[in-house]
Amino acid sequence: MLLEQQKQLISLIQAAVAQCLPEAQAQVQLERPKVAAHGDIATNVAMQLAKPARRNPRELAQGIVDALMAQPQARELIQDAEIAGPGFINFRLTPAARQAVVQAVASQADAYGRAPRNGEKVLVEFVSANPTGPLHVGHARQAALGDAICRLYDASGWDVTREFYYNDAGNQIDNLAISVQARGRGIAPDAPDYPADGYKGDYIVEIARDFAARKSVQASDGQPVTATGDLDSLDDIRAFAVAYLRREQDLDLQAFGLAFDNYFLESSLYASGRVQETVDTLVAKGHTYEEGGALWLRTTELGTGDDKDRVMRKSEGGYTYFVPDVAYHKVKWERGFHHAVNIQGSDHHGTVARVRAGLQGLAGIPKDFPAYVLHKMVKVMRGGEEVKISKRAGSYVTMRDLIDWVGRDAVRYFLIQRRADTEFVFDIDLALSKSDENPVYYIQYAHARICTMIGNSGASAAEIAQADTALLTAPSEYALLQRLAEFPQVVALAAQELAPHHVAFWLRDCASDFHAWYNAERVLVDEPALKLARLRLAATTRQVLANGLALLGVSAPDRM
């Protein structure tokens, strides 16, 4: 049922309730029955109102139905209504109401499922990897989730900025530099004098080789960095290695089809004095104290749910990792992004309350800023066994490995199809299979099958566009029409909950409904009018499948 139709039906039900219970304030909710035989849409409004009104719920439901069906507008939407169980009202739509989605999709095309611009802006930060190695499968899940959430925000009318925060300051960067230095001097990772916390992947050898060759590298948002070849200068090695890996990560993201609007460097917060300013402000406002030679933030007093106070400056000097995060999010707020979303691994759960506490102490920024989507681990399986190691990365499967093995469409869909807060097993064999069990193949095949069907039909686009949808009355056609009408509400729900898996589920279900219809009803029948009507339903399905796939960053192929 189209959203506009739902709004109209809710208004009509409220008017019917007012006739039965003039004093009642009806909060009408509609839902799709779990069993198709029970109708197209249902409400429990009679059950909600019966007890306070001291009425029998079934009798009240019947009164609401009688008052509703006396309205001419209701009869245009509702074919019949029945009372079920303790007082549910189940509605069946008129054929015209069911078929209205075809014209809605035809008139809106790519915009079907999208909302008008709302004048709001949001910053979504994701991937945000340390520039110390190739992007891994966890980063791939962030990339898939983050880009899909950005696309959902855009479809919901928001002005979206994609941002990548580089953790380019701290011990991990020093460990990168000494690792490259060691490999440049011919020290192998298994040698006793190799740095204890050094990185061991083959990519370290590649960096050392290019540093010795005095090559130049350039990240997408930076200036070229030319290697000096001086293995005694850790500063030179550090600058080249960071630029090298940032470029490598850029290439991984390009292979994934992902472009960021902005890159923000952690080091810039130190260089600009924003980290020190953050600490000084929290001290001046009385939100800190000294103990054991360390500086502590009174997070337990700042109302964000932290269970103990947190160290900001360690006793041996240097700030803990959440301090620059507080400074960074203060900068986000000052840039005018009062809506911000961070997509991070679930191992960052402990930082949420700390960052929000720091922001409360700094400027009284709302306690729910920023919003977080925390995702769990990805396990990669192949041939029934877990894949743990990539030769190039040394200790983990990379994002590029996944893309090379199964293609970016499968990577994106598979990493989105489950709730972010659940662990996910990425089955390489399943992602490569050409079967109904592979959801991305199943969905893309539905789109390609429609393209082939229309191409072989001999009908022109104009003939299909003018077909009479009143002929679409088969049960499988009604089921498919109902699914297509749900799409805008699914998009809105996915955006509201920051949960793109809702779209992935819908796409799978829509493909299933299409294949069921295709197998139940011949499309290219001898009767010209019916043939064109069914081709029009197929074309409508193709459009909405393409719209849904686009929200996930997945292609809609014409041929497979």
Curated annotation (Swiss-Prot):
Its main location: cytoplasm. This is Arginine--tRNA ligase. One of its GO terms (molecular function) is arginine-tRNA ligase activity. Keywords: Aminoacyl-tRNA synthetase, ATP-binding, Cytoplasm, Ligase, Nucleotide-binding, Protein biosynthesis. It catalyses: tRNA(Arg) + L-arginine + ATP = L-arginyl-tRNA(Arg) + AMP + diphosphate. Transmembrane segments: none annotated. Its EC number is 6.1.1.19. Belongs to the class-I aminoacyl-tRNA synthetase family. GO terms for cellular component: cytoplasm. Pfam families: Arg_tRNA_synt_N, DALR_1, tRNA-synt_1d. Monomer. One of its GO terms (biological process) is arginyl-tRNA aminoacylation. Disulfide bonds: none annotated. It is found in: Cytoplasm. InterPro entries: aa-tRNA-synth_I_CS, Arg-tRNA-ligase, Arg-tRNA-synth_N, Arg-tRNA-synth_N_sf, ArgRS_core, DALR_anticod-bd, Rossmann-like_a/b/a_fold, tRNAsynth_Ia_anticodon-bd. Signal peptide: none annotated. A motif ('HIGH' region) lies at residues 164-174.
